[in-house]
Design a protein with these regions (language model features):
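C-terminal transmembrane helix and the adjacent membrane-cytosol boundary/short C-terminal tail
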Residues: 49-53, 57-60, 64, 134-178
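Cytoplasmic-entry segments and transmembrane alpha-helices of multi-pass inner-membrane transporters
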Residues: 1-9, 46-47, 174-178
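Transmembrane alpha-helices
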Residues: 45-48, 52-56, 64, 70-106
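Hydrophobic transmembrane alpha-helices
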Residues: 13, 33-44, 94-98, 108-111, ...
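Interhelical loop and adjacent transmembrane-helix boundary motif
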Residues: 104-154
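Alpha-helical membrane-protein architecture signal
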Residues: 27-30, 37, 41, 59, ...
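Hydrophobic alpha-helical segments of membrane proteins
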Residues: 4-12, 86-106, 155-163
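Generic hydrophobic transmembrane alpha-helix motif, especially the helices
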Residues: 1-33
Length: 178
């Protein structure tokens, strides 16, 4: 799916955005962001939907029985009850986006530039590793830098997952004990 989304962004989204906005670079950080969102939204939606459907039906019915509207019930009862799961879904989506390689390589222009402009080509950490690891000399300084980037990517992804787990466990324990 990552290659398909990257190719879709490369062919369709990039051309459309350049035609509509007149952005000088066809492949840029905006196109990469759209591609990453296409990859991440289904994951976040699926996990958040599971979290919302895990909320007991009795909470929903009790809120409606007390005179709340459907919107009030959703906002004040269902969403707070499912908040740990929704939070976990968002952080897992961020972790997936952070580690995505193919979409970033195909849709952002994969230019080794350091810029904050979203309309210029860019390169992510994962794309740098994916692009350069095949040509690097083993044991060289370049290899060490790529290895460090891999460790950095692992640490950030692991930290996001650990924070998610700790937060969700804390919220669930608090909810079911008190």
């Amino acid at each position: 799916p990552s290659v398909v989304i990257g190719f879709f962004c490369l062919v369709t989204v990039a051309s459309f955005l350049q035609d509509v906005t007149g952005i000088p670079y066809r492949l840029n950080a905006i196109v990469g962001g759209i591609g990453l969102s296409l990859a991440v939204i289904p994951i976040v939606f699926s996990i958040a939907e599971d979290a919302l459907s895990a909320v007991p039906r009795s909470l929903h019915e009790a809120s409606l029985a007390l005179g709340s509207t459907e919107w009030q019930t959703a906002y004040r009862v269902m969403l707070p009850a499912a908040a740990p799961g929704v939070f976990a879904a968002v952080l897992l989506g961020i972790g997936r986006a952070f580690g995505e390689t193919m979409i970033a390589i195909m849709a952002t222009g994969n230019a080794p530039l350091s810029t904050w402009s979203p309309i210029e080509p860019a390169r992510t950490v994962a794309a740098t590793i994916g692009s350069e690891m095949g040509e690097v000399v083993w044991g060289s300084e370049h290899y060490g830098v790529l290895f460090f980037l891999g460790v950095l990517l692992f640490v950030v992804s692991f930290s996001l997952n650990a924070i998610t787990e700790l937060y969700v466990k804390k919220r669930l324990i608090k909810r079911f004990q008190g």
